């Protein structure tokens, strides 16, 4: 249902001042039990960065990116969430040391229901729509999202959002 609303471009943003650094810290706190279970370290670095955005939807973006980082990280790995002001924009990166994404799959990961390895469905769960929703929310805010990854060496998702 959520995906249908987003695809129909019915996303109404309830904009207010949102500090992405505070939001990232709140998401990290929500993941503490899972981080401890997998012996993962998660650090939030950077600076306070306030944008005009929909707090609930931006929380969803960070939550989904961190969820994927936790899900695909190997035990004792590290996850880094970094927030920086870049002129009229804010850059958010979520970097992990997980299993990475094969090069040929990178152009497809934001597609609806796409899974890089269907054999993982049972083990890691998920319907393959998380990144599709994340991308739609980022685009609705006038931003963009990209990923750099090397299979076996982790992934780095970068979101750039306008401050206004």
Which residues fall in each region the model found?
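Short beta-strand/loop element within the Bergerat-fold HATPase_c
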Residues: 76-88
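Short helix-loop "hinge" at the ATP-lid/N-box region of the Bergerat-fold HATPase_c
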Residues: 69-70
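Conserved glycine-rich
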Residues: 142-143
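Short conserved segments within the C-terminal catalytic ATPase subdomain
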Residues: 9, 34-44
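Short conserved segment of the HATPase_c
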Residues: 101-115
């Amino acid at each position: 249902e959520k995906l249908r609303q987003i695809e129909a471009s019915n996303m109404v943003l309830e904009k207010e001042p949102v500090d992405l650094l505070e939001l990232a810290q709140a998401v990290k706190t929500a993941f503490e039990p899972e981080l401890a279970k997998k012996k993962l370290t998660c650090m939030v670095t950077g600076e306070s960065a306030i944008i005009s955005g929909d707090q609930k939807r931006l929380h969803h973006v960070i939550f989904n990116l961190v969820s994927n980082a936790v899900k695909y990280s190997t035990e004792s790995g590290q996850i880094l969430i970094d927030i920086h002001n870049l002129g009229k924009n804010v850059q958010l990166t979520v970097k992990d040391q997980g299993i990475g994404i094969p090069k040929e799959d990178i152009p497809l990961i934001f597609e609806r229901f796409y899974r890089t390895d269907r054999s993982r469905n049972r083990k890691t769960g998920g319907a393959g729509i998380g990144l599709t929703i994340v991308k739609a929310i980022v685009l609705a805010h006038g931003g963009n999202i990209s990923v750099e990854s090397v299979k076996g060496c982790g992934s780095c998702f970068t979101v750039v959002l306008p401050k206004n």
